Amino acid sequence: MHLHEYQAKDLLTSYQLPIPPYHVATSLSEAEVAIQAEQWRSGVVKAQVHAGGRGKNGGVIVARSPEDLLAATDRLLHMQFSSNQTAGLSLPVNKVLISPLVEIALEYYIAIVIDRKHRCPVIMLSKSGGIDIEEIAEKQPDLLLKIALPSSGKIYAYQLRHIAKFMEWDKLVADRGNHIIRKLLQCFYDNDASLLEINPLVLTKDGDLIILDAKITIDDNALYRHPQLADWYDPSQENIRDVLAKQLGLSYIALDGTIGCLVNGAGLAMSTLDILKLYGGSAANFLDVGGSASEKQIQEAISLVLSDKNVRVLFIHIFGGIMDCAVVASGLVSAMQGQQGSIPTVIRLEGTNVDKGKEIILRSGIPCEFVASMSEGAELAVKLSR
């Protein structure tokens, strides 16, 4: 689960980390009250969306007067924000963050992420923070320091000395930087984060280290341990089908293809996506209904897949071990009877009650093609999608 910047800062503030004052506004009147209370003569207004690239895409506005702060708030509130990180979506801006300007001497980058290749957390640092960090990481990887961390969450003194030398910090700045790094690690581990990114961490002209922007992602599978964070979930920042899938308890990920998929089991679902690609097609979604889905869940899952206007073909791929093929068939019939028009449907059913399942589908009169193998089904689905 992604946090908004203001939520990330709320969390980091609880760890006594150095963050400039900020206010969140959902309206011009709230912004005006905050600006007057703080007596800010200038500042920055930032759209609160679950996406990077705000600085390059009009989501961050620097203002040099109280009037400009209000004008920036008015401009950003309720805009539809998109960037190369929004996966083609336009995200609504329902809140803005307002904070004072900071006199910056240097910008740094710090991130703690889960390195899945090495199966451990990694801290990454760069002397060149700011809006171009992605380009720097790609074109000048030598400017990015990566240090693997133990699962205990500790960082050792020799590692901190290495960081200070790499970042070219003097002793005073290094002491402050070490404190920040330790607190960031504590926050990362305490809250089961999968990403904690500070960009930029700035050295001010007064010699202070301050966090100007923060991005935090919490592991969805650990949210049951953090109900206070789960309450921060913002469904407005997600694809509506992703939101509905969560409400239905389904494992669903929207993709950009044209073949809608309903599969049971994550391994079979991923294999299905792979074989569709092998035959020259592409899936519109990943959807694992698991082994204990009810007829109602199957019906809603199929309706969810077909709500994507890009879907040209439905590929149902079920291996009924725990899953009952008759339940899948009944859910399919209920879903199709509620649809306007028809869509080409390819079905591979194997396992528990397969004959009964096929009988239910055939008796319903739903136009479909039964196949005997995964490869046959994928080839036919790709052909029908063209």
Swiss-Prot record:
The gene is sucC. It comes from Chlamydia muridarum (strain MoPn / Nigg). GO terms for molecular function: ATP binding; magnesium ion binding; succinate-CoA ligase (ADP-forming) activity; succinate-CoA ligase (GDP-forming) activity. This is Succinate--CoA ligase [ADP-forming] subunit beta. Mg(2+) binds at N199, D213. GO terms for biological process: succinyl-CoA metabolic process; tricarboxylic acid cycle. Keywords: ATP-binding, Ligase, Magnesium, Metal-binding, Nucleotide-binding, Tricarboxylic acid cycle. Residues 9-244 form the ATP-grasp domain. One of its GO terms (cellular component) is succinate-CoA ligase complex.
